[in-house]
């Protein structure tokens, strides 16, 4: 008996001595030696907990048989035997069950987390907060599988992926006729429990970021973003130097339409986060086309930063506004998905989940529908196999989740594992997503500024500048004031208009902004604005914008612009300026600036005259000092089939010598001109397209120098329509 007691005592001393050895090994970075030492301390609960925690980090998610996971579970089981009042031991044991690949292990997670929470009640601080957070996350994941539940009507039994892959009208019909929203609000009890645990966690640790993040998302899910805003305000007060806290603040501000403040908060977050975390948050990779993702990975950090700057400069909805609403939305989505769908156990961010990827690109869906597990045909072909045992049957009862986007007609199908909100694309929707990335790399339709943005019709025309090496740019813009002012009360409204030119690096070259007061009086009212710029040859980005105060409506036009040079030793033409009317101010006109021009947006009603004006440079004089050249105008129908239309010259020239039809869809006019030699030759005329049907027409103006034999051509498109001429 004495020998047995002595041996037992010696064993206890030996195992207890292993923890300091494990601590020393861990301090020098030798985790293998630390695990071995901790596992040998079989009578030390703390050592067993440390062993379980280290082993759990070595588990590879998705492995069916994992030695690391088995040993981790054994260590945590021993820790709970030795110290049943240890919350850390029970929490670790719950995590090993959650990581398991079988449903029977995972359905025990709730019970183990409840036990961990019971013993953590008297243990304030980080451990108690971690336990409460994990318990809340478990409840949240249960809710994820039951949120937005739809019920099948009596005559419908399954949701076929073929329905979702069909015509958009079939998808709409399915949701209108075959299913209905569950009025019982399933999952609300899990949501209540999750909120209760999260608030308990914050009482234990007010700056526990995972808890604050999930609670922010949860409050948003319940339409309580103002409460979330108050929560994040308290968070940044208590942790003013936390980038994660400011990121959550930015999310809540953006979702309560405080976009300017959200931009400031998110920029503050990026300045405070560790460099790697900041780079991940602002990364463009989640919104790139697949072919561009590899190139992104090969860029240096400096090159990525510059590309991000250029990307967001191009994406900014309005240059008249200092707030980049799309960039704010991108960052807010990144914060949202990371807290909603993150998987701490698998060390997976929310952006790496299937739903997270879709959300990053396309934002919140217009329809979010989940269906009862096992009701999705062709996703679970073995679900009805009678030889499957109960656990395997449960494993196949995945939850189908459908997301629909109205404006883009995108649709996605996900499949969620039972008792565990790990999602995958259902059926062949991974391929659907891949194709969608090429068509729509990213969309921001959830922003009213983007979704309701109207169009400014703009005509740009280039002419040779007065200074060598420069060109004049005429900008003729048509603001759809009537549409922008729809629903506005009577009275003057403030209108801001602007033409902004940027260089290839998106730095301002010219910015011309005008503020006025307008009185809308009909739905088709148009405000015209004209700008003229003198620019050297090069690549530019042109934006014309209009914002109407009082109703918060906006319109814009964006153009990539290649300013040409006009050498003096060759035959060249300016752009062809299309107008409703054009006439010289007097008989001594020398350039396009000497004309009265009533510009057009390129839209004409059937039978309306089309005025054309252009300049020709480099005509060669003959021995008498005169220039002689031929002008040919060709009108071609591009979008409709038109049989036998005719054109006639209304004014501007008196020496037309030819008119010919070329097939059923083209008509040509030809005439000759002669004049005294000048640096530039201005030509103008008005043409009526008799009986022209509605459609898109291309006008080709060709000038042939009869002295040198050289030829030059410019094209312009016009649309003939009976609809609103501003559209």
Residue ranges with predicted function:
Residues 28, 58, 66, 100-103, ...:
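Structural motif corresponding to the intra-repeat A-B loop/turn of tetratricopeptide repeats
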């Amino acid at each position: 008996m004495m020998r047995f007691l002595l041996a037992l005592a010696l064993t206890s001393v030996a195992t207890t001595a292993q923890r300091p050895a494990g601590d020393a090994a861990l301090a020098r970075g030798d985790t293998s030696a630390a695990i071995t030492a901790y596992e040998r301390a079989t009578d030390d609960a703390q050592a067993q907990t440390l062993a379980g925690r280290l082993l759990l980090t070595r588990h590879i998610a998705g492995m069916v048989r994992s030695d690391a996971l088995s040993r981790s579970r054994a260590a945590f089981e021993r820790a709970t035997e030795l110290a049943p009042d240890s919350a850390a031991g029970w929490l670790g044991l719950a995590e090993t069950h959650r990581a398991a690949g079988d449903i029977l292990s995972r359905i025990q997670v709730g019970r183990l987390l409840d036990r961990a929470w019971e013993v953590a009640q008297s243990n304030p601080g980080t451990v108690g907060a971690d336990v409460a957070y994990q318990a809340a996350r478990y409840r949240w994941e249960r809710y994820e599988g039951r949120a937005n539940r739809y019920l099948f009507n009596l005559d419908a039994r399954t949701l076929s992926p073929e329905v979702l892959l069909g015509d958009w009208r079939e998808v709409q019909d399915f949701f209108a006729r075959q299913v209905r929203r569950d009025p019982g609000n399933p999952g609300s009890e899990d949501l209540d429990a999750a909120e209760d645990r999260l608030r308990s966690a914050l009482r234990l640790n007010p700056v526990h970021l995972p808890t604050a993040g999930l609670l922010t998302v949860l409050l948003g899910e319940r339409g309580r973003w103002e409460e979330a805003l108050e929560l994040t305000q308290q968070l940044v007060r208590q942790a003013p130097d936390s980038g994660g806290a400011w990121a959550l603040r930015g999310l809540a501000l953006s979702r309560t339409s405080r976009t300017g403040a959200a931009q400031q908060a998110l920029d503050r977050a990026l300045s405070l986060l560790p460099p790697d975390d900041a780079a991940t948050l602002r990364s463009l990779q989640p919104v790139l086309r697949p072919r561009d993702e590899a190139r992104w990975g090969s860029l240096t950090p400096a090159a990525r930063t510059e590309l991000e700057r250029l990307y967001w400069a191009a994406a900014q909805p309005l240059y008249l506004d200092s707030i980049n609403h799309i960039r704010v939305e991108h960052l807010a989505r990144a914060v949202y998905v990371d807290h909603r769908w993150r998987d701490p156990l698998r060390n997976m961010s929310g952006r790496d989940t299937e739903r997270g990827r879709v959300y990053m690109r396309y934002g919140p869906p217009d329809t979010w529908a989940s269906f009862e597990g096992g009701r999705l045909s062709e996703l679970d072909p073995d679900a009805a196999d009678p030889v499957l045992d109960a656990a395997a049957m449960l494993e196949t009862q995945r939850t189908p989740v459908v997301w629909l986007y109205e404006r883009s007609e995108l649709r996605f199908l996900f499949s969620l594992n039972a008792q565990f909100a790990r999602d995958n694309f259902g059926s062949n929707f991974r391929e659907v997503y891949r194709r969608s990335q090429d068509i729509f790399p990213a969309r921001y339709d959830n922003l009213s500024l983007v979704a309701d943005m109207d169009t400014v019709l703009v005509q740009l025309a280039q002419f040779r500048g007065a200074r060598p090496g420069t060109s004049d740019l005429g900008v003729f813009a048509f603001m759809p004031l009537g549409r922008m002012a729809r629903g506005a009360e009577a009275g003057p409204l403030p209108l801001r208009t602007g033409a902004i030119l940027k260089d290839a690096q998106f730095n301002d070259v010219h910015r011309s902004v005008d503020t006025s007061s307008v009185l809308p009086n009909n739905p088709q009212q148009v405000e015209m604005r004209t700008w003229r710029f003198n620019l050297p040859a090069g690549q530019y980005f042109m934006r014309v914008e209009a914002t109407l105060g009082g109703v918060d409506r906006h319109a814009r036009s964006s153009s990539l612009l290649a300013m040409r040079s006009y050498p003096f030793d060759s035959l060249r033409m300016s752009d062809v300026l299309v107008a409703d009317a054009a006439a010289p101010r007097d008989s001594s006109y020398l350039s396009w600036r000497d004309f009265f021009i009533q510009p057009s947006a390129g839209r004409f009603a059937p039978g309306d005259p089309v005025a054309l004006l252009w300049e020709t440079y480099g005509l060669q004089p003959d021995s008498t000092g005169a220039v002689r050249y031929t002008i040919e105008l060709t009108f071609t129908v591009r979008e409709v089939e038109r049989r036998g239309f005719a054109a006639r010259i209304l004014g501007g020239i008196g020496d037309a010598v030819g008119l010919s039809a070329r097939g059923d869809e083209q008509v040509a006019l030809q005439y000759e001109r002669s004049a005294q030699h000048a640096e530039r030759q201005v030509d103008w005329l008005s043409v009526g397209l008799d009986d022209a049907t509605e459609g898109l027409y291309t006008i080709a103006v060709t000038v042939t120098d009869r002295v040198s034999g050289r030829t030059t051509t410019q094209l312009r498109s016009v649309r003939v329509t009976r609809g609103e001429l501003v559209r």
